[in-house]
């Protein structure tokens, strides 16, 4: 073979290799996008929402904070909605509330799950469960609640209807999960409503005994929503993370065409305050982001049987001020932080209202989880 032909062959091989690499990179990017969307569905983060024409965008024009800048980090509120009407605005209670804090230098992302039954100050006046804020005023009210009570500077949000998760799981042919007797019974019960809302079918597990099962979209979403077992809302968070991991693993096995179909399917279930320019800016570093530590808030808590003037079950921080200190130590370990007067006032009010006080031996300490 002549040198000229060898050179041509080499060029052809290089071109083929470039095309393969381009396709592989595009597939990897789509996998990351979908993983982040799934994270958001379960209350985590979504950065790569490229097909923006299909998303619902809400401009947050009246975001408030307690005067804190928190430079060096980008904080995003993530809401997983329990929507029956496919409406992503106010009127929906948030099934999941999370905060994604991105270290702009290292690209590491820390996630904090705020327990939805946590009693916090709402609209600067009354006290209610954290998940009530979105229902009353939509994403802007919910973001302001997080900023006011936790001394944060969140400027953006992403909301996803949890029903989108059922679509994704069905399109990756389900996930396999090990269930307890109690979980099978509760999942079967949740499936009735989930099936009705999604219009999707499922097969009831009978007999309802412990075992390893392949779950379709309706079943997996129902499993992730179970609350009424040992561990309550805290155990529910563990289930959500398991569904996330299982779904992410299946996404990595899909081809480019399937990934595109999945994105087209779930985009109408996404609402965000990010502009196209902001999302593309985040997306350019998609491969550099690394999901790091996660924890739940509050760190120290009680669930009193009764609170004067309130009915139902509430999660009460054992000293909001002390818990917020721990939160900042978790999110920003190398930055000094002193609670604002706003957080101190809210903390004192919660103490007086609920008769739940901080542990004096733990006050001001940090327990990263």
What are these regions (language model features)?
Residues 125, 269-369:
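C-terminal solvent-exposed extensions
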Residues 71-72, 170-258:
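Flexible, polar/acidic helix-loop-strand segments at domain edges
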Residues 85-88, 128-136, 151-156, 210, ...:
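Second-shell loop/turn segments in exported
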Residues 96, 127, 139-147, 162-166, ...:
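Extracytoplasmic/secreted envelope proteins and their assembly/folding machinery
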Residues 136-200, 273-275, 279:
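Amphipathic, coiled-coil-like alpha-helical scaffolding segments used for oligomerization/assembly
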Residues 1-20:
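N-terminal targeting leaders characterized by basic, low-complexity, disordered sequences
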Residues 17-107, 281, 314:
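Entry/capping segment at the start of metal-dependent catalytic domains
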Residues 71-74, 91-97, 106-114, 125, ...:
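Extracytoplasmic
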